[in-house]
Amino acid sequence: MAQPILGHGSLQPASAAGLASLELDSSMDQYVQIRIFKIIVIGDSNVGKTCLTFRFCGGTFPDKTEATIGVDFREKTVEIEGEKIKVQVWDTAGQERFRKSMVEHYYRNVHAVVFVYDVTKMTSFTNLKMWIQECNGHAVPPLVPKVLVGNKCDLREQIQVPSNLALKFADAHNMLLFETSAKDPKESQNVESIFMCLACRLKAQKSLLYRDAERQQGKVQKLEFSQEANGKASCPC
């Protein structure tokens, strides 16, 4: 089974544009605020963005998918250290003709970004520079956490993008690298770890008011990933 590969990147506090949205949960006797983390998934068409969101949010692989038109999102409520958090995963179109009218909308108030490429298609890997440029060009703060995901690693005989090349790219852009397969049920835990690591990091950040006060005092610190002996990325929870 392919494992998360640790680069030299770090996940850092999101910008003051909004650590998380809030909603009220009335399922309990009293209303409780639930934080919502918006994570967008970006990359070429047919790299498996939709399948990754299905695998994480629903635990399944769709029998049939169609090209995403504009943007779609799925949600999953998770519990981290006793707190319910709603992870909202935005699945974005990879084709230019479907993106133009929606691009500003799905970059707005984003908390984390997942860049996806197909390990069996070198062009999807080389196009990552274009996607990173688009992300940077839409006012996504540089401190918003970003990770790189190589999908379809179950197709071992067709792999065109070697892990060492992808890791070098991830390091150069201060990102963590994960290699996985949305299709292979054995990789479902690996897919979940991508989004859960981001959710854990976002949750670990202090409240906006307290963090902004620290920023004014110059005390905001990076949140670093630790490296375990087996090379896996270690989450804070």
From Swiss-Prot:
Cysteine methyl ester: residues bearing it: 237
Notes on activation and inhibition: Regulated by guanine nucleotide exchange factors (GEFs) which promote the exchange of bound GDP for free GTP. Regulated by GTPase activating proteins (GAPs) which increase the GTP hydrolysis activity. Inhibited by GDP dissociation inhibitors (GDIs).
Binding site for GTP: 46-51, 65, 68, 94, 151-152, 154, 182-183
Presence of the UniProt keyword Cell membrane in the record: yes
EC number: 3.6.5.2
Renumbered ranges of motif Switch 1: 59-71
Catalytic activity: GTP + H2O = GDP + phosphate + H(+)
Subcellular location: Cell membrane
Function: The small GTPases Rab are key regulators of intracellular membrane trafficking, from the formation of transport vesicles to their fusion with membranes. Rabs cycle between an inactive GDP-bound form and an active GTP-bound form that is able to recruit to membranes different sets of downstream effectors directly responsible for vesicle formation, movement, tethering and fusion. Modulates autophagosome formation through interaction with ATG16L1.
Protein name: Ras-related protein Rab-33A
Chain ranges for the short sequence motif Switch 2 as given in the UniProt record: 92-111
Ligase listed as a keyword: no
InterPro entries: P-loop_NTPase (IPR027417), Rab33A/B (IPR041822), Small_GTP-bd (IPR005225), Small_GTPase (IPR001806)
Lipid-attached positions, S-geranylgeranyl cysteine: 235, 237
Pfam families membership: Ras (PF00071)
PANTHER family found in the cross-reference section: PTHR47978
